[in-house]
Curated annotation (Swiss-Prot):
Name of this protein: Chaperone protein HtpG
Native source species: Aeromonas hydrophila subsp. hydrophila (strain ATCC 7966 / DSM 30187 / BCRC 13018 / CCUG 14551 / JCM 1027 / KCTC 2358 / NCIMB 9240 / NCTC 8049)
Family named by the database record: Belongs to the heat shock protein 90 family.
Region ranges (C): 569-641
Complex and partners: Homodimer.
Coiled-coil ranges (or none): none
Region (B) location: 352-568
Record Pfam families: HATPase_c_3 (PF13589), HSP90 (PF00183)
PANTHER family: HEAT SHOCK PROTEIN 90 FAMILY MEMBER
Gene Ontology CC terms, in alphabetical order: cytoplasm
Amino acid sequence: MTQSVHAETHGFQTEVKQLLSLMAHSLYSNKEVFLRELISNASDAADKLRFKALSDASLFENDGQLRVRLVVDKENRTLTISDNGIGMTRDQVIEHLGTIAKSGTAEFFKNLSGDQGRDSQLIGQFGVGFYSAFIVADKVTVVSRAAGTAPEQGVQWESEGEGSFTVADVTKAGRGTDVILHLRAEEDEFLDDWRLRSVVSKYSDHISVPVEMYKEGTPDSVGEGEEDGETIVGTPGEWEQVNRATALWTRNPKEIKDEEYQEFYKHVAHDFEDPLLWGHNRVEGAQEYTSLLYVPARAPFDLYNRDQKHGLKLYVQRVFIMDDAEQFMPAYLRFVKGVLDSNDLPLNVSREILQDNKVTVSLRKACSKRVLTMLAKLAKDDAEKYAKFWSEFGNVLKEGPAEDYANREEIAKLLRFASTAGEGEAQTVSLEDYVGRMKEGQQKIYYITADSYAAAKNSPHLEIFRKKGVEVLLMWERVDEWLMSHLTEFDGKQLVSVTRGELDLGDLEDEASKQAQEEAEKANAGLVERVKQSLGEAVKEVRVTHRLTDSPSCIVTDAHGMSTQMIKLMRAAGQPVPEQKYILELNPDHALVKKLGAIEDEALFGEWVTLLHEQAQLAEQGGLNDPASFVSRINRLLLQA
């Protein structure tokens, strides 16, 4: 390898500088993971070359035996991880090794606490890949040449993990990438042949590319004992495969240990943490495929970025085709990682071909169903573990009913909510739990959406339900309103918002209660008309209500109107929102409303009516358009009291 004069120095992206500093100074309890990450990258490079060579065999350059090699140089204290995969061009080296091209980076650094143990877990969760080399090395040299380019188009990248790196043109005879680690003084264990072999066996048995190390030969020797005087012929040195190099998903699930599944997940997902659960499934018949699907233990930083790449590793007849094949997993299951190996897709498949392919549609349905079945079993068998899943991925799963109509009922069974029957804001109540506790005569499932748990729990709309002992589901996440606009029924029972339309408790109310309501409406007809005239265009309608027991007033939307939370959701998304007028409901039994009816001075009456309307707006919407006028009005009325 010879170096040319075309050398440049580049500064690292700010986030990379921070990451490298963490790599150098974090006390990793498990330093050996750097080798897993680098071998995993080398394996991916081999997979990508194998796929590209399907349409251009010349990329193999008469060397189709793909492999990864570990080379130890004890004298110079270097460990080299070498592959003959796809390789990189100069521009690719600068892009991939000088920047972190993933969303969530800023949030990742914001979450770092300075606690080395906790930060090490976060680093693993973020997935640092190549940069893990700096855990054990104080200098890293990368020499690469892209397949299909001339030997003199090689490139060398080098950095000591500080603020910059150098890039130079070099001549490299073979394609692929060599990552040369100049080990720190205290990392001699990674120069030991047997130590490296044990790490490879532990982490890389499952990858399909052979990992090789050089086995020294033995010289000729003279025998002793019965063979005294005879010459024993030595053995030549040779490259020896040290991993099984068998794709894990092709093996019999009964023969695979949990530890092997866990290590394969870390390879596929580039995660340092064990998965929460997994499912290995082989199907034969009209379609033939194998899926190995994992649910991570922790949500990635970019989970809520729906445009971020997600999906499965796609193989066709054990040949790697692509990463992040999102066509096989709906967006609401974008947290799922794993492998799909199909015998029914063509080897020359592209993302465009996958888009409208019948096989793709069928596989997507099967994979979605498989994940939902795994989650249902987890919820049934291990409530504590499912609660952990829900805390990480629950809000994403709530997108499901809008996206996957066919599985809406199965998704609904997996949802969890807080409720007025529980203590605190823990979301532990399923819809099946709710239905099982419904009061005699109750025909509907009641819920409320609000800005926060406190706003939902203390809403005046819940007063009549508390009085009658009827459970109400409490929702305050931004996605909840979107969810409930698509989940309108469960187990044959309608889901009803307590803040929309006229209150109808059905058989929960007796005839005497209904009669009393009608009488209250008649008795307060004059007051209602005065309030309407006073508020004018500020409200859609005014009426008396029996939904309140402690509050004097509340506002509601009509049965088909847009809810407060949906309006906020659309505004946050920059969507145009039509003007919304609310219905003001008055509690005829409240002292303030009775006092209101006795006020003859129209100006004073108007002040009190406006105050009751603003109070109701504040309780429902969490804010007012003109809070200063509200405060002034309260002060004026207090002075008159």
